[in-house]
Amino acid sequence: MGNMMHRGKGSFTHVENTVFFDHALSLKAKGIYCQIRSLENNPEWVFTIRGFATLVKDGVDAVTAGLKELESAGYIIRARRRSENGRFLKAEEATWITLDDPAMYANVAAELKEEGYAILSDFKRDPATNVEFELENDFPSGGTDG
């Protein structure tokens, strides 16, 4: 069986393995999640779907579909504050929170609600369906093709 190796410059993004081994997510959604995580600590970057779509080849529709997939799976919470008159603030002022594991969703959403946010994400997955994995058990016994 061949080995995988990496040589790089040292700049990296930490991503929990849970998202990679979630068989319910498409590669598109996993890629979008990782790209977002790579940008999170850039204080000058303001997340908008259109702005994010300029960074990738797939375009606004594909990004929107991938984000909806991540939201419904519980890896992203989209939240927005309301103004004093009850209207939502501009889309540019929305808050997007990435989660390492969908099991965190309920607690984080509750914290956001306490802070005055409205939760806009449509989380459809039962957290009990999230599968804990062991790395050695996630691969076929004969290794991988390739």
Give residue spans per PLM region.
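Compositionally biased, low-complexity repeat tracts
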Residues: H6, L27, A62, R82, ...
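Small/flexible residues
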Residues: K9, R80-S83, L89, P127, ...
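Generic alpha-helical secondary structure signal
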Residues: G10, R50, D61, A103-A106
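Short amphipathic alpha-helical segments and their helix-coil junctions
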Residues: S11-T18
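Winged helix-turn-helix DNA-binding recognition segment
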Residues: V19-K30, Q35-E93
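Charged low-complexity intrinsically disordered patches
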Residues: T95-G146
